[in-house]
């Protein structure tokens, strides 16, 4: 059952990689396009948010929540964190953006009052051409919300991750250009995180190759982590969750 669930998430996540060309030759992930491909992702978003609401009545307060996009959605937390004293809840939604996370803070976080939050969000903003200022403002608003509504919650903010050339098998993407934007956005969010008293965890540096791309052995499609990549993420963040 778990394998089927993860397969469904993976297929949904891959559908985000349909692209359209921009005048400068950059590519957009279809999640962020205003045409019909977005409707499927919007439906998935709505279904996930509704599912979170149903889960909340059965979830314990004071646990750990991972929140983000498809990289989080695909992360089988039970395989890596079952030995912790606290439960880990996955609030990732494939194709999500900073705007999407901001819209669902109540159901994803506030309702279950976690003591620790692990946030990774922003790659779909970058690949969708969202202006940096808008993304950073949304990111700040997310952290503002946590600070106001969950004042005692410890928050760990993961770096946005690079892509690898494997993505070129399904989409025409300017990998060096997009990865440069990822690095710039990571620099943009660092002071925001620090200003809130939260912890920035640099996973990018641990998964990059000599060309600052996602190492091919850590991904099957060029953007999402596989089990090798999840192991590195786990090794980085788990000591903070003990």
Where are these regions (language model features)?
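Charged helix-capping and loop-helix junction motifs
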Residues: 132-142, 182
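Serine-esterase "nucleophile elbow" of acetyl-processing enzymes
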Residues: 19, 23-113
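N-terminal Sec-pathway targeting helices
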Residues: 1-20
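Active-site segments of SGNH/GDSL-like serine hydrolases
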Residues: 123-126, 144-182
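Catalytic His-Asp segment of secreted/periplasmic serine-dependent ester chemistry enzymes
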Residues: 164-242
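Generic structural signal for well-ordered alpha-helices
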Residues: 105, 139-143, 186
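Cell-envelope and extracellular/periplasmic
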Residues: 92-94, 121-126
């Amino acid at each position: 059952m778990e394998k089927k669930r993860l397969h469904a998430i993976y297929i949904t996540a891959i559908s985000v990689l349909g692209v359209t060309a921009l005048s400068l030759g950059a590519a957009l992930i279809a999640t962020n396009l205003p045409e019909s491909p977005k409707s499927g992702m919007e439906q998935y978003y709505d279904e996930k948010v509704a599912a979170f609401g149903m889960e909340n009545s059965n979830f314990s307060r004071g646990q750990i929540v991972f929140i983000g996009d498809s990289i989080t959605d695909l992360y089988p937390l039970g395989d890596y964190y079952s030995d912790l004293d606290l439960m880990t809840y996955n609030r990732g939604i494939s194709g999500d953006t900073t705007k999407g996370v901001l819209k669902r803070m109540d159901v994803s976080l506030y309702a279950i009052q976690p003591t620790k939050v692990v946030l990774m969000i922003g790659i779909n903003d970058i690949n969708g051409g969202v202006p940096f200022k808008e993304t950073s403002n949304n990111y700040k608003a997310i952290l503002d919300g946590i600070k106001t509504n969950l004042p005692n919650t410890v928050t760990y903010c993961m770096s946005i991750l690079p892509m690898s050339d494997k993505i070129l098998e399904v989409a025409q993407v300017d990998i060096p250009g997009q990865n440069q934007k990822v690095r710039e956005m990571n620099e943009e969010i660092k002071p925001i995180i620090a200003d809130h008293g939260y912890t920035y965890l640099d996973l990018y540096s641990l998964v990059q190759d000599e060309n600052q791309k996602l190492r091919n052995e850590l991904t099957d499609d060029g953007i999402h982590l596989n089990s090798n990549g999840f192991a590195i993420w786990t090794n980085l963040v788990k000591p903070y969750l003990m």
